[in-house]
Regions:
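Catalytic machinery of carbohydrate-active enzymes
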Residues: 10-403
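Flexible helix-coil transition and linker loops at the boundaries of alpha-helical arrays
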Residues: 1-6
Length: 403
């Protein structure tokens, strides 16, 4: 009898496959609930169920799902982290960031930064900053640090901080200095030279203590500015009247979600390159740079700036000369968005929290437009949508020049 019962229990793979092919929201909810009842201690079952329910826009049920996962797996951090990210993605910023901080604080600084934060003055936990000095400490990737630079101004203007220092990774130092958002910018490699402050704080901690409404964020953009570094000549000499579009199609392959966020090949965008009146300028570095260089040799309207760009400030100078930046979710999307440049971001079905759920705009970057890969869809459908909008922009620019 025990053997027969065991045979009647579907495998995890069969359970999740059935969930993926649910034909309606109600069927998906029923199958998901059955899946977590059958495998109540398997985190990946909760995770897959949450993704499938998101397809059907059932965020309320996802709330309960992650709460159940936390209860079932009290000793694991991933349920708490994903519950926090879900809240942030929904727009519940303070609640989500508080949950996130409670989770990340378990691990200490090693999971967040490369250099230990100061031990000689305290971490900020929401105390009054009126007349105080504070350090925003380097955390996670370049895109994260660019995104959170906006909070230097927030700590001064809303919280009353008298002096704000930003400690960041080496590639960002000159770019951040040019922005003048912080009173001082220090390379994290030189953190030992940091003078005493009243407090230090990780960037992700700030919204846990400073209430923010997603639809009423403090004006911040632009908070990056192009440096005096001259943009590449091929960009400056582009014919008058053409639409100049920057392109980034891959992120760093070491990123945990890179398989979903990066395009498999530049060829995915081939339909765009056939448009007349549009010149494309690759800002690609690292992975994908060789492919971009090959395209530049084959197409007269595709130019590879990768070899001309050696720093983030040079990237910003190039972005300043473009009409539009078309990019996957990389640090360049944050550079362009923070500069107030029209930025079109290609996103996977399940994107990073800062792009939130289902939005086509970004409260954080008012000039950004989001092109999401639809659930069960592929990149060519996204590119077809982009092509239509690019054609409109190209025609508008040509008419403006003719006038």
């Amino acid at each position: 009898e025990i053997v027969l019962r065991k045979r009647a229990v579907p495998t995890v793979g069969a359970t999740l496959d059935a969930l993926m092919h649910a034909g309606s929201a109600d069927a998906s909810i029923e199958m998901g609930q059955r899946a977590v009842r059958t495998y109540p201690y398997a985190f990946h079952v909760y995770h897959r169920t949450a993704m499938e329910w998101l397809r059907w826009e059932r965020e309320e049920e996802i709330d309960s799902l992650w709460a159940q996962c936390v209860d079932r797996l009290p000793g694991e951090h991933l349920p708490r982290l994903y519950r926090a990210l879900h809240e942030i993605s929904r727009g519940n910023l303070q609640e989500g960031f508080q949950l996130r901080e409670a989770t990340m604080s378990i691990f200490g600084w090693l999971r967040r930064t490369t250099v230990q934060p100061p031990a000689t003055f305290p971490e900020w936990k929401g105390e009054s900053l009126t007349g105080k000095s504070i350090v925003i400490w380097s955390e996670f990737g370049l895109g994260d640090e660019i995104f959170f630079l906006r909070f230097a101004r927030l700590l001064r203007e809303r919280c009353g901080a008298a002096y704000v220092t930003v400690v960041c990774q080496s590639p960002l130092v000159k770019l951040f200095e040019e922005s003048r958002e912080a009173d001082a910018v220090i390379d994290v490699k030189n953190a030992a030279q940091l003078p005493a402050h009243d407090y230090w704080v990780f960037p992700h901690t700030i919204p846990a203590y400073v209430p923010l409404e997603l639809e009423a964020l403090p004006p911040a953009v632009p908070f990056l500015r192009a440096s005096p570094v001259k943009a590449p000549a091929v960009l400056l000499s582009a014919p008058r009247g053409v639409l100049k579009v920057g392109v980034v199609f891959k992120g760093a392959p070491t990123h945990e979600n890179d398989r979903a966020r990066s395009l498999p090949s530049l060829s995915v965008l081939d339909e765009l390159f056939k448009l007349k009146g549009v010149e494309f300028f690759s800002l690609q570095k690292g992975a994908g740079a060789d492919e971009a260089a090959q395209y530049a040799q084959r197409l007269s309207n595709f130019h590879d700036l990768g070899a001309c760009i050696a720093s983030m400030e040079e990237t910003a100078s190039a972005v300043a000369e473009l009409d539009l930046v078309l990019t996957v979710d990389t640090s360049v999307s944050h550079v362009a968005g923070a500069m107030g440049k029209p930025t079109w971001v290609l996103l996977p079905s399940y994107g990073d929290w800062r792009w939130h759920y289902r939005r086509e705009d970004s409260p954080w970057y008012p000039t950004a437009r989001l092109f999401r890969r639809r659930f069960g869809g592929d990149w060519p459908e996204v590119v077809a949508r982009i092509r239509g909008h690019l054609l409109v922009l190209s025609n508008e620019k040509q008419l403006a020049v003719a006038a």
